[in-house]
């Protein structure tokens, strides 16, 4: 089978530094053949790196969408433009994969879910954390400690003043709800929800620590899952002063605990302690997780390739409905904080 021809819409930092290398790693499956940026000079710069001929560089969105040689669209746009690109891509008969967050707000996200579920074309959200190898290992171990009772999630770290993504205007003045809370927080939510299930309601307090974040950049929340049998805490923010980077999810069951530790991206581990009491307390088991340098990006593209090539959208894991729930959790955090921590139910698409 010939590789799928990819049209890149939005040729910024992540397109160049992460999407393109992933595509180039699998030349038998993908070929980036076209690029769009409303500033054509930026598209031309990307084209040089991607080896795209100049006649396939566009500053008119309709032209790349209607290019008969493009098999699908990879859209890396500010979130407020995602609903528009989905509508236009589907109308042009093109599958489309979007960068997260799914949209700038829940109304736009609902529209994307509606369009995606009314077409046979694959429409996906590129949530790479859904594909982390640690998830499979952790799921197997969580089955051993059940029933699950509670969890603690923590993703905290120091503010990185040289963060290259802070230079982008759409992040400095975000139109998407929560700014960095939705831009980065949806990753953490993808991990927790993949392992434990959807959130039902939250009580949260959010704050803006750094002016450069453009919006609230930390959240401390308590959570009740949709099944109401599991409660937990969710903490996220990398806007603090000097501190260690700490990313972990600890799951408490009646018969033990499972901890997913991603603090060191290059050396993730899953830790397990089995036993039903202090007296019945087994030795800790540590499961090393294979290092994935792409941190799930390669796997998400291979999954989307499968869905497009087989013309079966059900094969793709990162559905708009799934991504909607992640954004809806951020929306609930913000609404709860505005009500001084009152419990808020997670909105449905």
UniProtKB/Swiss-Prot annotation:
Phosphoserine sites (modified residues): 2
Example of a GO cellular component annotation carried by this entry: cytoplasm
GO BP, sorted A to Z: NADPH regeneration
GO terms for MF: nucleotide binding; oxidoreductase activity; oxidoreductase activity, acting on NAD(P)H
SUPFAM superfamilies for the chain: Glyceraldehyde-3-phosphate dehydrogenase-like, C-terminal domain, NAD(P)-binding Rossmann-fold domains
Signal peptide annotation: none
Residue ranges that the Swiss-Prot or TrEMBL entry lists as coiled coil: none
InterPro entries: Gfo/Idh/MocA-like_OxRdtase_C (IPR004104), Gfo/Idh/MocA-like_OxRdtase_N (IPR000683), NAD(P)-bd_dom_sf (IPR036291)
Domain of life, source organism: Eukaryota
Disulfide bonds: none
Annotated keywords: Phosphoprotein
Misc remark: Present with 9600 molecules/cell in log phase SD medium.
Protein name, UniProt field: Uncharacterized protein YMR315W
Organism this protein belongs to: Saccharomyces cerevisiae (strain ATCC 204508 / S288c)
């Amino acid at each position: 089978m010939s590789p799928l021809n990819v049209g890149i819409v939005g040729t910024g930092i992540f397109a160049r530094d992460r999407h393109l290398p992933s595509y180039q790693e699998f030349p038998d499956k993908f070929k980036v053949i076209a690029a769009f940026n409303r500033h054509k000079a930026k598209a031309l710069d990307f084209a040089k790196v991607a080896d795209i001929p100049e006649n396939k560089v566009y500053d008119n969105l309709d032209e790349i969408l209607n290019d008969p040689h493009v098999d699908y669209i990879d859209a890396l746009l500010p979130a407020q433009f995602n609903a528009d690109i989905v509508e236009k891509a589907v109308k042009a008969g093109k599958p489309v994969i979007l960068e997260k967050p799914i949209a700038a707000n829940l109304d736009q996200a609902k529209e994307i879910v509606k369009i995606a579920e009314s077409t046979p074309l694959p429409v996906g959200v590129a949530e790479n954390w859904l594909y982390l190898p640690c998830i499979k290992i952790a799921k197997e171990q969580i089955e051993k400690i059940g029933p699950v009772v509670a969890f603690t999630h923590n993703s905290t770290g120091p503010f990185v003043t040289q963060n290259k993504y802070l230079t982008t205007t759409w992040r400095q003045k975000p139109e998407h709800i929560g700014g960095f809370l939705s831009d980065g927080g949806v990753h953490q939510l993808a991990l927790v929800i993949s392992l434990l299930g959807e959130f039902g309601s939250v009580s949260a307090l959010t704050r803006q620590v750094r002016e450069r974040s453009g919006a609230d950049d930390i959240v401390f929340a308590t959570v009740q899952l949709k099944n109401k049998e599991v409660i937990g805490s969710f903490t996220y923010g990398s806007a603090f002063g000097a501190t260690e980077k700490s990313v972990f999810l600890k799951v408490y069951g009646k018969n033990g605990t499972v901890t997913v530790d991603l603090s060191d991206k290059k050396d993730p581990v899953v830790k397990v302690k089995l036993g039903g009491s202090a007296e019945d307390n087994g030795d800790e088991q540590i499961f090393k997780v294979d290092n994935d340098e792409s941190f799930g990006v390669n796997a998400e593209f291979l999954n989307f390739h499968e869905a497009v090539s087989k013309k079966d959208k059900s094969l793709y894991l990162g559905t708009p409905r799934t991504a909607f729930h992640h954004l809806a959790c951020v929306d609930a955090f913000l609404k709860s904080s505005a009500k001084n921590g009152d419990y808020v139910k997670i909105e449905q698409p």
